[in-house]
Amino acid sequence: MLKPLGDRVVIEVLEAEEKTASGIVLPDSAKEKPQSGKIVAVGSGRVLDNGTKEPLEVAEGDTVIFAKYSGTEVTYEGTDYLILRESDILAITK
């Protein structure tokens, strides 16, 4: 499994809708880039200016909304993930 460093998290991206509310099937070129996903791994935390380590506010299993073009897309063992900094996460959905 991937283990992110520092203040980074690994997210399994939730796919965008295939159809509109009225039932129209969207081609790949018309789909919005997904902005939500489930956290599958978190780093050890961010290092503060005084040298202490602060744990992250998010945890494995949280579903989050993140900035549209943030992070780095990676494929690991056949699954696509997004690795991004905690500061790119906008909200946790419950």
Curated annotation (Swiss-Prot):
Q: Which UniProt keywords apply?
A: Chaperone, Cytoplasm
Where in or outside the cell is it found? Cytoplasm
- Its job: Together with the chaperonin GroEL, plays an essential role in assisting protein folding. The GroEL-GroES system forms a nano-cage that allows encapsulation of the non-native substrate proteins and provides a physical environment optimized to promote and accelerate protein folding. GroES binds to the apical surface of the GroEL ring, thereby capping the opening of the GroEL channel.
Q: Which InterPro entries match?
A: Chaperonin_GroES, Chaperonin_GroES_sf, Chaprnonin_Cpn10_CS, GroES-like_sf
Q: Which SUPFAM superfamilies match?
A: GroES-like (SSF50129)
Q: Which CDD domains match?
A: cpn10
Gene (name only) = groES
The name of this protein is Co-chaperonin GroES
